[in-house]
Each structure stands twice: as structure tokens, then as C-alpha cells.
Amino acid sequence: MTYVLFLLSVGLVMGFVGFSSKPSPIYGGLVLIVSGVVGCAIILNCGGGYMGLMVFLIYLGGMMVVFGYTTAMAIGEYPEAWGSGVEVLVSVLVGLAMEVGLVLWVKEYDGVVVVVNFNNVGSWMIYEGEGSGLIREDPIGAGALYDYGRWLVVVTGWTLFVGVYIVIEIARGN
């Protein structure tokens, strides 16, 4: 299980390095889609079935449309790949080398600490009492998001709406 999580994490980091070198919009969108799938697999591997499915449906469902549209608008006759130019290939290799160096440095000095502390988790408790009950963590997290983070949801929705509006206005030519 740990080995699978490690391989998924390496794939996610390699996807980010591949996106940051972005030789062509086609490959950048493809790498983001693959990284989204790998991120959903990491969430599923850690036991978050509901959240992994929601991220998969919302992120990949919405973003594949956006990536398809932007790729169609910005496609070149001969798109540049990661191995087609020395500069792009060197940037990918330097990015991967820096990630490997970071992993080795963290492993050597054991500098990973938990920086998030949940102080009021008790107010999220749904079932208290004698006996057994079965409540998954995912629905509790979704409920907490819409209860305690309602303004975050509103701001996020408004930001997405404004972003779509700006993209439509730019694509229209006004």
C-alpha cells in the first residue's frame, strides 16, 4: 500500500514537472489531466472514495472541456514535444533532478512535520453514544465544507464564474 502511494506521488510530481516545462498547450493540458487522475487515485488510496470521485467528476469533467477548447484555439502545425528541443528537455531533466534532490534532502534530515492542527474537531462529531455506528469520513468532510466553509464555497463559485466570463469575452474578441 505504501509502495503504491509512493509511486502515485512520484507520478504526480513528474506530472507537475512536465506541466511546468510546457512545450506545447496540447501536452500541458494532457499532463494536467493525467496529474488530476493520479491525484484522484492518491485520494482513493488514502480511503477518500467520495472526495476522489467528486474531484474526478468535477475537475476532469470541467477541465477536459476547457483544455479541449484552448488546445483547439492555440494548436500549432507542428507542436513542440519534450524531446524536440534541447531547452525543453533540459528543463524537464533539471526539474526532475531538483525533485529528486529535495526528496533525498528531506530523507536525510527528516524535516517533515505536521503544520496543521485541528482544534475544534469535536464540533464536527455526528454520532456520540454507546454502541457501534458506521459513518464514513468523506460525507462528514463534505458537510463540514458546506457548514464551516460556506463563504469559501461562495467565493470559489463566484471566482469560477468570473473566470469563465473572462475566457468567453476574450474568445469572443471584445
From Swiss-Prot:
Topology relative to the lipid bilayer, per the entry, is:
Multi-pass membrane protein
- Which molecular function terms from Gene Ontology are attached? NADH dehydrogenase (ubiquinone) activity
GO biological process: any one?
mitochondrial electron transport, NADH to ubiquinone
List the record's Gene Ontology CC terms alphabetically.
mitochondrial inner membrane; mitochondrion
Aminoacyl-tRNA synthetase listed as a keyword: no
The keyword NAD appears for this protein = yes
Keyword annotations for this protein, in alphabetical order, are: Electron transport, Membrane, Mitochondrion, Mitochondrion inner membrane, NAD, Respiratory chain, Translocase, Transmembrane, Transmembrane helix, Transport, Ubiquinone
Q: Which InterPro entries match?
A: ComplexI_Subunit6, NADH_UbQ/plastoQ_OxRdtase_su6
User: Which positions, given as ranges, span the membrane?
Assistant: 1-21, 24-44, 47-67, 86-106, 151-171
Q: Where in the cell is it found?
A: Mitochondrion inner membrane
Catalysed reaction per UniProt?
Answer: a ubiquinone + NADH + 5 H(+)(in) = a ubiquinol + NAD(+) + 4 H(+)(out)
This enzyme's EC code(s): 7.1.1.2
Q: Which domain of life is it from?
A: Eukaryota
- Identify its protein family: Belongs to the complex I subunit 6 family.
Function noted in UniProt: Core subunit of the mitochondrial membrane respiratory chain NADH dehydrogenase (Complex I) which catalyzes electron transfer from NADH through the respiratory chain, using ubiquinone as an electron acceptor. Essential for the catalytic activity and assembly of complex I.
The annotated subunit structure for this chain is: Core subunit of respiratory chain NADH dehydrogenase (Complex I) which is composed of 45 different subunits.
**Could you tell me what this protein is called?**
NADH-ubiquinone oxidoreductase chain 6
Organism of provenance: Gorilla gorilla gorilla (Western lowland gorilla)
What gene is it encoded by?
MT-ND6
